[in-house]
Design a protein with these regions (language model features):
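Metal-dependent amide/peptide-bond hydrolase catalytic core
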Residues: 1-117
Length: 117
């Protein structure tokens, strides 16, 4: 029988393929290195952006998966604080990418957000 949740860590595979998805980090990722983590929060094969996926968000599985992702990212951050060489490698890789693909913000400089009311 197939499992309904991912139950293994996929091996690292270097690739230049882009994962076409949206995130909330946009401009930030052009200023400093960012991380992304996938963890099992819903049944394998559930289409994204559907009510079926949303309905799984209140389950203990989703909660445990989110905690796993948070712990993974926190441990990664701790490693960067502990190992300054690793942090420098991340910064150098980021610099190499942004040097060859400079970022230009699509929002004109004269545009400013209105104050919250």
């Amino acid at each position: 029988r197939e499992t309904v949740l991912a139950n293994e860590v996929a091996p690292y595979a270097a690739t230049d393929n882009v994962l076409a998805a949206s995130t909330d980090v946009g401009d930030v990722s052009w200023k400093l290195p960012v991380a992304q983590c996938f963890s099992p929060c819903f049944a394998v094969g559930t289409p994204l952006h559907t009510w079926q996926l949303v309905s799984q968000g209140r389950t203990s599985i989703a909660h445990k998966g989110m905690l796993l992702a948070a712990k993974t990212m926190a441990a990664t951050t701790l490693n960067l604080f502990i190992d300054s060489g690793l942090l420098q490698e991340c910064q150098q890789e980021h610099q190499q990418v942004t040097d060859t693909q400079p970022y230009h913000c699509p929002i004109p400089k004269k545009v400013t957000p209105s104050p919250l009311k």
